[in-house]
């Protein structure tokens, strides 16, 4: 696994950041108005700077591509894959809700300011969504399938699903999967504010407060940036041999759902799509052990949080698992959010611990051993996805 976000870029650093229970959302000016966002740490930003000057071709790459490139290298190294392992039987599927947001807005802004000037010749190839996975595939040396896609905020989980399908079908032996997103631009923040869901508490200790019990309820969504990629393959315990210590988690099952849009953000009060996704994942579980913890999608919006909690109650009844979130730490990272949640899940499985909400919420958690975790994601268009991962044996 490789990651980069406001939390840091190494597993130990990220886990320690979670344990501190501090928000990484900071107030910044956007179009003469302050907004809370979670940017990469300075050390993480330095990594991107080094990547950008590493080769002439990297000079024009968008932040999403550079973040994904770093994460892929880390994931391959952590998995112990060699160049000879990778070959044409290794695939890449990286999702992004919006793709090359930063670069596209910069280039389009330059065009609007002076449309008579010749635009940058590489504008089209450098801003297409497919540029993320193709750049990563070249960087790690695979000749296998490379896929980029957007399923809005469920994007990263669908990348995992695709990887599973390719491997199970026998078309690939291993896959790099995950999501990358860099949405911290003036136009993107303005879009969220137009929906009236962005937090107005940019200077608060916790600008984003998913599932808060405060009254009257308020929407407190905020944006962050980051990427997480994971190395995935199908192996038995015997096949793993001495490399079993490299296994971070086991995919138990997954589910997906879709509902007809009822609102501008395609959310129903009952959370129909999420309930469908969770029920499918629970029905297809490989083991009988119950889900101990659910990492919520909960974006910090009134309707979004309420919808998901209603769906969870309809699926689990009165005996709820632990409910956790990382959006009060790092904000909503759109297409990368579920990948960051998956990273959080794997760290929780490794440490048998989680970060409790630092403010009052509308439910009460009861601590228990954490062996199996469900990750939820939902997005514009009425789609939802759910992944269940388990702690490796031993």
Regions found by a protein language model. Give the residues of each.
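Short glycine-aspartate micro-motif
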Residues: 89-93, 172-177, 210, 372-375, ...
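Condensing-enzyme catalytic core mediating Claisen C-C bond formation in acyl metabolism
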Residues: 1-3, 11-12, 16-29, 33, ...
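Conserved small-residue
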Residues: 18, 72, 92, 136, ...
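Active-site-proximal alpha-helical scaffold in enzymes
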Residues: 68-78, 129-132, 137-140, 146-181, ...
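Conserved active-site "lid/cap" helical segment
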Residues: 12-93, 100-101, 273-290, 315
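Structural signal for terminal/edge beta-strands and the immediately following C-terminal loop/tail
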Residues: 367-394
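Acyl-CoA/ACP chain-elongation machinery
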Residues: 171-218, 254-269, 296-306, 320-363
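Conserved catalytic cysteine-centered active-site region
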Residues: 26-66, 99-162, 194-222, 303, ...
């Amino acid at each position: 696994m490789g990651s980069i976000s406001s939390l840091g870029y190494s597993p130990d650093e990220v886990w320690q950041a979670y344990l501190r229970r501090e928000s990484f959302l900071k107030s910044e000016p956007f179009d003469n108005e302050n907004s809370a966002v979670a940017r990469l740490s300075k050390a993480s930003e330095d990594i991107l700077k080094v990547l950008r000057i590493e080769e002439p071709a990297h000079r024009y790459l968008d932040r999403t591509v550079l973040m994904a490139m770093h994460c892929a290298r880390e994931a391959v190294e952590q998995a112990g894959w060699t160049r000879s392992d990778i070959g044409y039987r290794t695939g890449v599927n990286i999702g992004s809700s919006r793709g090359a947001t930063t670069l596209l807005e910069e280039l389009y802004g330059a065009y609007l300011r002076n449309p008579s000037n010749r635009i940058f010749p590489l504008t089209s190839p450098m801003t297409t969504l497919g540029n993320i996975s193709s750049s990563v595939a070249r960087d790690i040396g695979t000749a296998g399938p490379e896929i980029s896609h957007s399923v809005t905020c469920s994007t990263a989980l669908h990348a995992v699903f695709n990887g599973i399908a390719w491997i199970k079908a026998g078309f690939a032996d291993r896959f790099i999967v995950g999501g990358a997103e860099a949405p911290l631009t003036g136009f993107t923040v303005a879009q969220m504010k137009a929906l009236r869901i962005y937090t107005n508490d940019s200077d608060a200790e916790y600008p984003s407060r998913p599932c808060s019990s405060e009254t009257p309820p308020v929407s407190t969504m905020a944006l962050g940036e980051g990427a997480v990629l994971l190395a995935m393959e199908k192996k038995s315990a015997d096949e793993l041999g001495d490399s079993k210590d490299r296994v971070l988690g086991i995919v138990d099952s997954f589910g997906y759902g879709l509902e007809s849009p009822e609102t501008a953000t395609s959310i129903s009060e009952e959370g129909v799509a999420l309930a469908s996704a969770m029920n499918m994942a629970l029905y297809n579980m490989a083991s009988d052990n119950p889900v101990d913890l659910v990492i919520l999608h909960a974006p910090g919006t009134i309707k979004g949080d309420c919808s998901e909690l209603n769906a969870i109650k309809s699926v689990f009844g009165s005996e709820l698992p632990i409910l956790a979130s990382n959006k009060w730490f790092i904000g909503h990272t759109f297409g990368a959010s579920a990948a960051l949640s998956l990273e959080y899940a794997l760290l929780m499985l490794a440490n048998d611990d989680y970060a409790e909400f630092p403010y009052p919420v509308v439910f009460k958690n009861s601590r228990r051993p954490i062996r199996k975790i469900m990750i939820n994601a939902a997005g514009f268009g009425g789609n939802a996805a759910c992944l269940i991962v388990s702690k490796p044996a031993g």
